[in-house]
Structure formats: structure tokens, C-alpha cells
Amino acid sequence: IADMAKRYGLGERTGLEINIPRESKGIIPDPESKKKTLKALLRRHLNENRSVYMSRLSSDKEKDAAVDAIVKTLDDKKPMTRDEVYNFLQDLKVDSDKVGKDQRVPLADLLKYTYIDQANWNMADTMNVVIGQGSNAYTPAEMNRYAMALANGGDLHPLTLLGGKKHDKEPVKQVGLKPKYYKDL
């Protein structure tokens, strides 16, 4: 899916002459970006709730180390069970039974079911991407260029706001699908 999106120019700049600030590009969802986002969200939540979860830790250095250790659990090959999460937090002297700000469940459940169980890409993520849900985030210019490539048989032209501008540095790319597929569109 990501390969096809890239072939159609999604997730890249379109060639528009926008320099200040530079033209934005969209985001093609993938496993790495999903995990990176979840880690950032977890780190932010833990830091915002240090006084709730980490009251047994005395120094900022200990609290920083606990946050790092908790966030690192999202990289584990084998996800921990709920009991393992609870014991892990207890070993860190983090209050796993406390409920953080704007939460309804204790930290052990939040960590297990909202972060650890969701950290790895799964079929649900793929289905969300396919139907245009989830983390798809494309600019209107990217979508315009995508539709143009569909309509013209697969030529991916750089976009321009200036009439008659030549894109000598950026040649027309071929998407690489067989012409018979465009006739069905």
C-alpha cells in the first residue's frame, strides 16, 4: 500500500513553487510512524502525570529513567501480559493502580491496552489505510496530483502555480501500471 501511494506521489512534495514556508508533504501511514507516535503520546502522558504515578520516586533522574523504561516496552518483541505490566510498574516503583489526569483506567491497564497492544501494525491498521481512515494525511495538492495521474494514464507531473513554467529538473514520472487498468477507471 505504501509503495503504491509513493508511486502516485503521495507523501512527497508536488513541485508547487511554495518556498516560504516550504511546501508541506503528506504522511503515508506505516508501522514505524505508528510506533513513533504512540511512544510520543505515552511519554507525554507519563510526563504530565509524574506527580500521580511516580510519587514514590524522589529525583527527576529516577522519574526520567522510569519514563524511558516504560516507553521502551513498546519495542518488546513479545508484548507483556497485564500481570507482567503490573509487576513491571511495581518494580519501577511506579503506582500502577493510579488513574492519570483525564483517564478512566489505572496506569497498568492504560499501558497494556492503549499502548502495548496497539504498538505493532496489524490487519486493522491496513484496513483503515485502505479505506482512507487512520493516519492518512495528504495535502490537497497531493490529492490533485494523484487524481491527475489517474486521469491521464499514469503520468505524474510536477504541479505548478505559474503558467508555462518548465520543470526541467523534475521530469514526468510514470506510475508504472498497465494502461488497461486506466481504461477501467
Task: Please annotate each region the language model reported.
Residues 1-184:
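Beta-lactam-recognizing serine transpeptidase/beta-lactamase-like catalytic domain environment
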